[in-house]
Amino acid sequence: MALLNITSPHAQGANRTSRLMLLVVYATIPGMFTMTWFFGPGVLVNVLLASISCMLFEALAIKARQRPVGFYLRDFSALVTGVLIGVSLPPYCPWWLLISGSFIAIILAKQLYGGMGFNPFNPAMVAYALLLVSFPVEMTQWAQPKPLWVDGQLPGLMDTLAKVFSGAPIDGYSGATALDIIKQNKGLVLGDLYQQQPLLAEGRWASAGWEWVNIAFLFGGLYLLYKKVYTWHAPVSMLLALALMAALFYDSGSSSSSGSPLFHLLTGATMLGAFFIVTDPVSSTVSTKGRVIYGALIGMLVYVIRTWGSSYPDGVAFAVLLMNFAAPFIDYYTTPRTYGHKKPRRATDSTPRNGH
C-alpha cells in the first residue's frame, strides 16, 4: 500500500504547498505572454511541452517509489519546474532538448535526492546549466524579439511546431542577445554600439523586447511579495547587488564598459532569476540575514559572469547553483540560536552559583 510521507501538521500542509505553487505559476503569466508577444508562439510550446514532461517524469518517479501519485502531483511543484524550464530555454529549440531538461530537473536534480524538500540545488537551473554546457549551439539560438503584429517577423504556430519537432534551423529569426552583443564587442564605445545594433537602438532603457519581458516578470514577483509567498530579502538584495556592481564599473559608456545598472536589471533573466529562481525555499537559505547575504552574492556573481566570465552571456543559472552549494554554510553562521539556549560554558569557568 502506498503511504504518505509528509511532516506535521497533516491537516493543511499539502494544500498550502499546492496553493503557493499555483500562485507562482499564475505570477509567471505576465512574463510568459510578454515573451510570446516578442518571441512568438514557440514560448508557449516550450512551456506546454516542458510542463507535461516534468509532470510525467514526476509521476513515473513517484510510482517507482511506491507513493500515491495523485497526492504528490497535486503539490504542483513539477508544474512550476516545467514552466521555469519552458521560459528559460530558447523558443523553437528542439523538442528533445525540453524533454532532456525535464528529465534532468525531475529525476536527477529532485527525485534522486528524495523529492520535494530534499533537493539541494534548484532543479530548473540544474537542467539549464547542464543543457547549456552540453548543447551550447541549441541553447543560444534565441529568436530576435519582434512584436507579433509585425507580419513575417516571427514564425506562426504551424511553422513553430515544424521547427520544434523537425529540428529545422531558425537562422532567419535567430540572432545574438543584448548580453552577447555587449560581451563580444568590448572594443567599441557603447554609444557606437547602440547606433550599430538595432536590438540595442530600438530599446527604451536596455534592449528591445527584453526590457518589457523583465518588467513583466517584475510585476509577477511583486504579486508574489504581495501574497506573502516569500519575503523581499533575497530578490531585493540580488537586484541591489547587481545594480551596485554595474554602477561601480560603469564609466558612462567607454569601450571597457559592460552596460549601465539599468541595462543589467532589464536584460537577460534578471527579474526571472530574482523573483522565481533565487526565492526557491528548498535550495536557498532559511534565515533572514542569510537570505540577504545569499541574494547579494548571487547578484555579484551574475555581474562577474556576465562581464568577465566564459562565453556564456548570462550568469543567473551558474550564480544560483554556486550559492545553492554555499547555502548550508551561510545558514550555519546566520541562523539564530533557539530561544533559551546559550553558548556552552567553558570547562575552566568555575563561577559559583546560588552563593555556594
Curated annotation (Swiss-Prot):
<dbReference type="InterPro" id="IPR011303">
    <property type="entry name" value="RnfD_bac"/>
</dbReference>
<keyword id="KW-0597">Phosphoprotein</keyword>
<keyword id="KW-0812">Transmembrane</keyword>
<dbReference type="InterPro" id="IPR004338">
    <property type="entry name" value="NqrB/RnfD"/>
</dbReference>
<feature type="transmembrane region" description="Helical">
    <location>
        <begin position="20"/>
        <end position="40"/>
    </location>
</feature>
<keyword id="KW-1133">Transmembrane helix</keyword>
<feature type="transmembrane region" description="Helical">
    <location>
        <begin position="259"/>
        <end position="279"/>
    </location>
</feature>
<feature type="transmembrane region" description="Helical">
    <location>
        <begin position="292"/>
        <end position="312"/>
    </location>
</feature>
<protein>
    <recommendedName>
        <fullName>Ion-translocating oxidoreductase complex subunit D</fullName>
        <ecNumber>7.-.-.-</ecNumber>
    </recommendedName>
</protein>
<comment type="function">
    <text>Part of a membrane-bound complex that couples electron transfer with translocation of ions across the membrane.</text>
</comment>
<keyword id="KW-0288">FMN</keyword>
<keyword id="KW-0249">Electron transport</keyword>
<feature type="modified residue" description="FMN phosphoryl threonine">
    <location>
        <position position="177"/>
    </location>
</feature>
<comment type="subunit">
    <text>The complex is composed of six subunits: RnfA, RnfB, RnfC, RnfD, RnfE and RnfG.</text>
</comment>
<keyword id="KW-0997">Cell inner membrane</keyword>
<keyword id="KW-0472">Membrane</keyword>
<feature type="transmembrane region" description="Helical">
    <location>
        <begin position="117"/>
        <end position="137"/>
    </location>
</feature>
<dbReference type="Pfam" id="PF03116">
    <property type="entry name" value="NQR2_RnfD_RnfE"/>
</dbReference>
<keyword id="KW-1003">Cell membrane</keyword>
<dbReference type="GO" id="GO:0055085">
    <property type="term" value="P:transmembrane transport"/>
</dbReference>
<feature type="transmembrane region" description="Helical">
    <location>
        <begin position="315"/>
        <end position="335"/>
    </location>
</feature>
<dbReference type="GO" id="GO:0005886">
    <property type="term" value="C:plasma membrane"/>
</dbReference>
<keyword id="KW-1278">Translocase</keyword>
<feature type="transmembrane region" description="Helical">
    <location>
        <begin position="205"/>
        <end position="225"/>
    </location>
</feature>
<keyword id="KW-0813">Transport</keyword>
<keyword id="KW-0285">Flavoprotein</keyword>
<comment type="similarity">
    <text>Belongs to the NqrB/RnfD family.</text>
</comment>
<dbReference type="GO" id="GO:0022900">
    <property type="term" value="P:electron transport chain"/>
</dbReference>
<feature type="transmembrane region" description="Helical">
    <location>
        <begin position="68"/>
        <end position="88"/>
    </location>
</feature>
<feature type="transmembrane region" description="Helical">
    <location>
        <begin position="229"/>
        <end position="249"/>
    </location>
</feature>
<feature type="transmembrane region" description="Helical">
    <location>
        <begin position="42"/>
        <end position="62"/>
    </location>
</feature>
